[in-house]
Amino acid sequence: MRHYYTADQIRAAEAPVLAALPDGALMRRAASGLATAVAAELRRRAGGVAGRVVCAVVGSGDNGGDALWAATFLRRRGVAAYAVLLNPGRTHAKALAAFRAAGGRVVGGGDVGVPDGTDLVIDGVVGISGTGPLRPAAAAIFAAVGQSGVPVVAVDIPSGIDVHTGAIAGPAARAGLTVTFGGLKPVHALADCGRVELVDIGLELPQTDLLGLDATDVAARWPLPGPRDDKYTQGVVGVLAGSAAYPGAAILCTGAAVAATSGMVRYAGPAAAEVVSHWPEVVAAPSAAEAGRVQAWVVGPGLGTDEAAFSALTFALSSDLPVIVDADALTMLARHPHLVSARAAPTVLTPHAGEYERFELGPVGDDR
């Protein structure tokens, strides 16, 4: 089980450790873990560590200090290390001194981009105390980095993303790897942080009610068929998707149901021949009414919004079965919300931002 902690919980857990350790020791401990992760990422992406080029984009907080110390440790492994200081007057002084003493080079202020030939960028702009989008100088740097395809390793969180909600209100760094310290934060579950690696820095963390499943938890809960099971005890999924214009949607949606280890998949709609040619184990019918016994429906992908499509949506939602509503079915449902207003059975809507807006439920957040 993954445990997630607020920024305040992390800071409270850090306080006794900071008091017990020499000044700067906890930062160097975190930076050592960061440097190890960056070295592994260099091997994975650039084929090695020594001789590779790393550039830290450094903000004014402790995250910038972490990035500078990590770059310092990487210098000792033969990495050419550069730093772009976004706020030179507020850069972590001891970390910057160590970086320069190790042969690291400062390439200018925030109006200067990362050097040509950089193999990896360390995002040390803002950490768990930061809020809001990237400021213009940092935004320009990370926009250029994104266009160049240079990989980014974020320190704690990708800068510009809200640590509590994962919301992105403007320019933000896009990281292929995020290295975080002490404990996971909500942002690591709510936003795209790339791969997330947790570095143990010796914090004693409290109990938390912010929990998430990992692969082991899912595997432990995943039902496995026994000797007395059949297709009905394992679940029969009915798929209402596709049309003459979009038969591929039916193929993809039905294939997803097959891959999800449903006990049986039934398809109902005009793309029956195409579906069965790709998935011969699927039982196909021309309409939902003729589909046979179903225990849950998915309706909408490529369905269209004509009368036949509306009939399929109505059929699914008028049942007492669980229904997933997606794509064209969401468009129709936004026009006819009464179809779900009195539903007691489980109903899952999966809108993207544009589909969400059609429901007129308020501003679109990153998690809709």
Spans of features found by a protein language model:
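N-terminal small/polar loop signature for handling phosphorylated ligands or for N-terminal nucleophile
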Residues: W69-Q147, E274-R293
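Polar low-complexity intrinsically disordered regions enriched in Ser/Thr and small residues
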Residues: V106-V107, D111-G113, A169, T305-E307, ...
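Internal gly/pro-rich beta-alpha loop/helix module
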Residues: T118-L120, V125-L210
